[in-house]
Amino acid sequence: MTCEVKEKGRVGTINPIFTCQPAGAQFVSIGIKDCIGIVHGGQGCVMFVRLIFSQHYKESFELASSSLHEDGAVFGACGRVEEAVDVLLSRYPDVKVVPIITTCSTEIIGDDVDGVIKKLNEGLLKEKFPDREVHLIAMHTPSFVGSMISGYDVAVRDVVRHFAKREAPNDKINLLTGWVNPGDVKELKHLLGEMDIEANVLFEIESFDSPILPDGSAVSHGNTTIEDLIDTGNARATFALNRYEGTKAAEYLQKKFEIPAIIGPTPIGIRNTDIFLQNLKKATGKPIPQSLAHERGVAIDALADLTHMFLAEKRVAIYGAPDLVIGLAEFCLDLEMKPVLLLLGDDNSKYVDDPRIKALQENVDYGMEIVTNADFWELENRIKNEGLELDLILGHSKGRFISIDYNIPMLRVGFPTYDRAGLFRYPTVGYGGAIWLAEQMANTLFADMEHKKNKEWVLNVW
């Protein structure tokens, strides 16, 4: 038996796993303090993305649109960008960073966004807003290639390339978290804090889990500042935790400022978290404290309680963001589970060269399929027509109908998750994330078995 990597066998897409590149750029923009992105395209390119963000995080986020119409699609719509920047800066006096995010329509018609930004910098900003600090950043994210993952990767690079400067080198690291949840950022900051490591966190979205304060105010925007972004050029190392969600920025900093780039591994599970901490130790010289050794021991004890009795040999399908899917698969293997189908939902040609996928191909001793450019039909067809047997599905809420229709238990993980409450508060990374994931997988299986076995199933069946 082998691990086989293959592309989707169809040209068309049936029920996509991902949305498009501009969504990734918009997610970057809401992670920056005093930033509102302008999406140069139709209003739906913003409206539906904002809806998904709000469904997942249960917060409202500010994003703008150039409101492209039919005439702009025919004759060009650079004027819409100029008007959008003018209106945005007039209405929001605190905004300092304005990404201009392109879409499929504006890329196809060839609108010169870089030229418009140059014109605005030399004209409108000097004439109407002479005393304001305003940064206009072009982000080219056509929707007809890639996905929200590649759009995120491009946008992080563009932001870093715009701001990073070499001033006074320091002992900080750059932490490029990738597309994660507030709970993940909190867990990562906890690990760094225990090791006494300072970091420029891209992006600081812990505040998405925002309080409503006694005065009625609430904060629901990112807290990565312009100063943090500038300081990325002074760090001693850059950690891109996800290979496909931050590597472009890490490689830029390495090439421009000779800052070492450490790519991955995504710290999901005990093994990958251990590697992450060892990499931190090597890069900074800071020791791994006993407190983290204690947390590791607690996590190992929790996993030992579940692995052999409840999780071993369970057949799992996983879909979503590639780094998340691969990290979850590695974790499942450590728990003696069998991830039999991995669905990576975009057309990235680099998957075949991914060392983690190569390791799966070399080490897996049962039948595993990894499908690139996949959609949900790749999962449903295997269940419905090819007899794929599964004990568990891991993925975001968009795939819930397959779980419901075929009576297969499913743990919601990834983005977007909107049919279970509060999951964005919990980490999937670090030792805390390992405990949460393992216990949630077990509890999902327990709840399913209650409906399929007698009430004493846990004693008589497992």
UniProtKB/Swiss-Prot annotation:
PANTHER family documented for this protein: LIGHT-INDEPENDENT PROTOCHLOROPHYLLIDE REDUCTASE SUBUNIT B
Q: Which GO terms describe its molecular function?
A: ATP binding; iron-sulfur cluster binding; metal ion binding; nitrogenase activity
CDD domains the UniProt entry points to: Nitrogenase_VFe_beta_like (cd01973)
Q: Which family does it belong to?
A: Belongs to the NifD/NifK/NifE/NifN family.
**Which gene is transcribed and translated to give this protein?**
anfK
Q: How is the cofactor bound, in the record's words?
A: Binds 1 [8Fe-7S] cluster per heterodimer.
Top-level EC class as recorded in UniProt: oxidoreductase
Know the name of this protein? Nitrogenase iron-iron protein beta chain
The organism of origin for this protein: Azotobacter vinelandii
UniProt: [8Fe-7S] cluster binding residues: 20, 45, 104, 143
Q: What is the lineage of its organism?
A: Bacteria, Pseudomonadati, Pseudomonadota, Gammaproteobacteria, Pseudomonadales
